[in-house]
Amino acid sequence: MFSIYSMYFIFLILFVDKINVNGLDPSDIVIVILDQKEGYHMAHAEMLKKNILEQAEALDKDPPKIILSHKLNINGSWTIIPLLNYLLDTYSTSKWFFFCLENTVIRLNKLLSILLKYKENKNIWIGHVLYDQEPTIIHHFAEHKKKLKYPHIASGFGITSNLLANLVHKINEGDRPKDDFSIDASYEFASFVLKVGKGVRLTHVSEICIISNSECATYPRFFHPCGSSVTTENIYFAVKTCSKFHIERIPVIKRTWAKYATNIGYFSDIADKHLPDSFIVPNTTQGHCAKTYSILVQADKILKKKNLNWLIISDDDTIFSVARLLRLLTCYNPNTPVAIGERYGFQLWDSDYGYEYLTGGAGVALSASLVHEIIELGKCECPSSTTPDDMFLFGICLSRIRVQPVHSSMFHQARPSDYATAYLASQEPISFHKFWMIEPQTVYDEWFAEADKSLITVRKHTEL
């Protein structure tokens, strides 16, 4: 009897000890919310932080360390790599680092259960795996013998303290990325980890989800509008074109999204009787800075005359859902300087000269007050007519007038086929770009036509 009791007691001690050694508390984790300074995004980041703290309290545990990246003022923090040194220096005793966005939903207890399955002293990172079906422009047409796995950031991904320390060691040895352009932070970070982490590949975890279900530890929350006050009557669409594409592209735009635009102008190099709502602006074969600046000057007058709130600048091969664009704009104040689109970076590894900008092909939404500032302050005249317009006007110029561009993942610089299927499944896209090797009418019909039908009903009610 004594021996049986003794064996049971020893087993119990060993079992409890094992739990204590291998257990993972919320306080062992650092959660990094890759957020933005703009009010709407910052508010959602604060709500996520509050929710995580409440979950930790419900578990009767000390909470995770939670970082809102915008508060660190680290240049290019959205590309992740610039944050790593700070994280290791500040939270050297933490076991896991979990990165997410402000629209990520986190079920803390389930996340802890997942992380507990892996050893933090190993080079491991976990997430929801995405991969390219074929080489794509947004990933520099890179080809890999084995498909590169990269995480869906909106679902979140975790990195062990050991892997993070090894990455920082490589960075400090000078082995940091020196690519000029940052386009897709997730893909580029995965490439970096694979290169300097001795072949460490992302581990797929099904509970880190794209679409919510009861088993999910995390998943991205779909966008919800903040009101219903923005209508097509509040917006002016400026389409950049040239005579070369009047016949090939403009009819496509008019058949698809432009038929829902109450106020629209086509900015071209020559007059065209088939484009009565057109304006003549200087054209160049590259860069287009003078052309886009001329559009801003003309649009500023139109916005003032018609008392409009928003300017949308579009290429002549950009495809929109006007209805989804209107819903997005309900979350921003047009009386403050706001620029919204898809964010790219240029030489972000250079803390003195690197900057971010909104890429023009995806479409750019500018508040009327921002357009007025760009023109009236006189700080944004193009260095040359062929300077890249988006990099200068929606990057350097915004920096000069102290306006940070707002990134929305629903704007897309490329075609649907250039993105991972699961990535697009987690959102409702607003735009795609390029009429190259696609049928643009089909793209519009498949992605946007159904959403835009709601505008037909709205217009009928308005006319009544």
Residue ranges of model-derived segments:
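Secretory-pathway lumenal glyco-enzymes, predominantly type II signal-anchor Golgi glycosyltransferases
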Residues: 2-464
